[in-house]
Amino acid sequence: MTEVSGRLFRILSGDVIKTSKIRYAKNGQDFPFGFKLDDQAHGSQKELSVHFISPEYPYSPEEIRMHSAGKDELRVILESDARVLSDLRLLIKTEKYIKRKQGTSISAIEGQILQTKGAQNTGREKELIERVKASVGKSTLVINAADISSSSQDALVRVTDGFQELISRTYTQLKLLDGRTYSEQQVAGAANPDSGLFDAAEASKLFAPSEEVLSFVLRKEALGEQVTVKTIVDSLTAKPYGWDLASIEVLISFLIGTSKVTLTVDGNLLKRSEVATALRNTQKHAHAVVSPQKTFDERRVAAFRKFCTDGCDEPNAPKDPLELARH
């Protein structure tokens, strides 16, 4: 990485974009991304990338499009401004000159000259930042060899527009959540259907995505693999899902509440009332084992519960078969 590309990256990331997460408008979820500039990764990389292409990139626009095929990145081809890079070089050169001179004994007049040069350089940097912003605002956006449209010439809005398309294309199973995200405050309610926190309409929205979680658990079980909460989270936060952590916790909790799976921590089978605390504690995720719940004859369970409520005078006997057995 050259000094010039390093400085251009700092301007793009720190002065133009100023964030490492972009909100998906359809569900309000923040998606992190990594930065790239001319094929060079800068900083920590994520599943998604915003890849800036500078005027010095050695490939043609058509080649740039072709090279983007099959990649989970938004390519931002900066509008060509030959002076940006030459002015960046001058900026760096002047900074070095001032720094070197300040380390020596200089006269009062030389000091004034350096001060003037420094002020000019500060102005040059501000002007450069504005020009880079304008270049991003007029950039060509490319995802998977196809151009993406945006009507905005605001740098961040334009990149955000392109990123919306990248999220939609990468996380094709995000639609199972139907534009919703759930919060950690809803985990307890999902595990306890009688709590009334989810009405029938809300609960029905959880059905399709929770069945996807159940299918994942059953597939892993069939392969003889132990499934932990961490296993589920790692798989479903990644593509093609892109689901957020709290929503996954709510879906696991909902499966427990509907007696589809059980949660065991350190060998202890958890009651529904204990589930939320374990799921919300990410440090427990690697030790929290999710298993398909054994199915029971519903008529026998109902009869046994009736026996408990009527014969044993226990109106609050649990509905879950396993909890009823332990009651």
PLM region descriptions:
Residues 1-327:
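Extended alpha-helical interface modules used as scaffolds for assembling large macromolecular complexes
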